Structure formats: structure tokens, C-alpha cells
Amino acid sequence: MKAIVLASGGLDSTVTAAVAKRDGHDLFFLTVSYGQRHRIEVDRARQVAQALGVVNHVVLDIDLRAIGGSALTANDPVPKDRSVTDRQGEIPSTYVPARNTIFLSLAIAYAETMKASLVYLGANVVDYSGYPDCRPEFLNAFEAMARLGTRSGVQGKGIEIRAPLLSLSKGEIVRLGASLNVPFHLTHSCYDPLASGVACGHCDSCRIRREGFRAAGMTDPIAYAEAEP
């Protein structure tokens, strides 16, 4: 069965792709280059696609900098060195307005074209504590919308939205990825990398990634600008 995977080149989407492959699906990657400051993730998505042997990889250029509203698409500072407590209970400045709504809309369009009935994305419990478009309620509502607003849906075939990491902590995601031989060394998580592409080690995404590998009892294979204290 064909599966569309929203592939950012990050840890979560790569583990998600490995889950879809484990489950016997033919992988079709969709990556969106949206003007993000960490554009290196698009290159990493290409490398991951090659490593996992995807059938096809579409990279769309949609520049969301024209809309703005996020530290990821503007020159606003990316939050650094925030504690777990600091990261809870608020929508961070790295939230990109309606990003998953946009990405999932593109994914179901791709799914219809490829006659695929599955769309995978890497949303998880760490994300939906701060990002409203990673919540289970949102994903369920989007799937219902897709049934009403697509040819596949009105013809009774539908497109299922799957987020297999939704209930997992970052440590559990890392352990799952390790069991599936995920190429962690190819993935990129940092929101504010150096010009060389090396992860800053201080943004929320870097800290969460490091916490995940630490919880899993594993060494993160990527380079950081500074060693973990």
C-alpha cells in the first residue's frame, strides 16, 4: 500500500517513515521548503529518502516568509536554553501559523494524485504540548475534513491520517528508531543552526532531542556547536 510521509528531515518524521516502511508500505515523501531558517533540513530529507529507498520524493517550495508570524520564518530570535518548565503551557515563537494545516492539505493532494490512502506525519506528545496543530483533536478533525473535501473521500475511499508517535515521549521515539535502524546521523532537528549546518545545542528542538537520547541511554550521532554540559 502507498503511504505519503511528510518528511522534514528531522528525527520524528524519519522514525515515522521507518514505521511506515516496517508496516509494509511503499513510501512517497513530501517535503516542504517554506523559507525556514533551518533549510538544511530539506537536504537532510533528501538524504533520508535515499537511505530508506522511497519510491518518489517531492519537494515543494512554498515561501511562508511572506506571511511571517514565526521565529522560523523571520529574523526574530529563536528561544534558547529554556527548561522543561519554561517550554510547557505556552505556544512558542517557533510556531508557524497553520503549518500542519498547510502541509497536510498538500499531503492529501499528493495522496489523491498517487491514489494513496495513508498520510503519515511525526506529531508526538512533546509537540502537542506547545503546538496546537499537533494535537490528536486537530488530526482527527483534519481527517474528517479530508473525507468531506476530497474526491477520494466523497467516493468512500478516504485518506487516513496516521501519527504513530503521538503517544510517545522523545526517549521512546529514539528507542523505537534504534530498533528500526533509523539513520539518526542523517537527521536534523536544530531551529537555529550555524552557517555550517551544525546544531546550536541550545534551542528547544536541540534540547528536546538531547533529552530524548539521554532518556534512551544512547549517544546522539550528530554534531553540536557545544558539548552537552
Regions found by a protein language model. Give the residues of each.
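Mid-to-C-terminal catalytic subdomains of enzymes
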Residues: 121-126, 170, 174, 183-202
